[in-house]
């Protein structure tokens, strides 16, 4: 039987597995699928986590949900550190407590070049499973709390622009269509 990888080794593993995954772009309907629970941490899940981390770092981004790479399982990778060496893996995450409200500027790898303000909880407590298969709880505030909530929205089929007014959503959609036409030309 293969031993689960310790949480700290995931970032090391990413240095050797170099699979960059395709990130879905808003308004792709697959971004609205609700992710399912991960029943167990298998070799395939470890490989997916490694590939997601590599994709996130290469993009570059600070968080990525499996939904964004068209895998509809409850998996998130995050690294908000300045040194980009503190990978956090959350499998089957759930927010069990939250407090405060803060409006922050957000962007998304699935909505490239678009940034806007969203109000979220200032602090959250999350329960999740790590890549080692062990359950844990953690408190998060600031950018980490925002990132966790943003990525968990993806697992529920929601993209951050859906918090914005219909007018802003329409303008964003127009801008993204223009970007897509420029890339084709």
Curated annotation (Swiss-Prot):
InterPro entries the UniProt entry points to: Peptide_deformylase (IPR023635), Peptide_deformylase_sf (IPR036821)
Q: Which UniProt keywords apply?
A: Hydrolase, Iron, Metal-binding, Protein biosynthesis
Question: What EC number(s) would the UniProt record show?
Answer: 3.5.1.88
Catalysed reactions, as listed in the record = N-terminal N-formyl-L-methionyl-[peptide] + H2O = N-terminal L-methionyl-[peptide] + formate
The record's comment on cofactor binding reads:
Binds 1 Fe(2+) ion.
Q: Which GO terms are recorded in the biological process aspect for this UniProt protein?
A: co-translational protein modification; translation
Lineage, top-rank taxon, reads Bacteria
Active site per UniProt: 151
Indicate whether Manganese appears among the record's keywords.
no
What SUPFAM superfamilies has UniProt attached to this entry?
Answer: Peptide deformylase
Q: Does the keyword Transport apply?
A: no
What cofactor does this chain's UniProt record say it requires?
A: Fe(2+)
Q: Name one GO molecular function term.
A: metal ion binding
Binding residues for Fe cation, per the UniProt record?
108, 150, 154
PANTHER family in the cross-refs: PEPTIDE DEFORMYLASE
Q: Which family does it belong to?
A: Belongs to the polypeptide deformylase family.
Q: What does this protein do?
A: Removes the formyl group from the N-terminal Met of newly synthesized proteins. Requires at least a dipeptide for an efficient rate of reaction. N-terminal L-methionine is a prerequisite for activity but the enzyme has broad specificity at other positions.
Protein name, please?
A: Peptide deformylase 2
Organism the protein comes from: Nitrosomonas europaea (strain ATCC 19718 / CIP 103999 / KCTC 2705 / NBRC 14298)
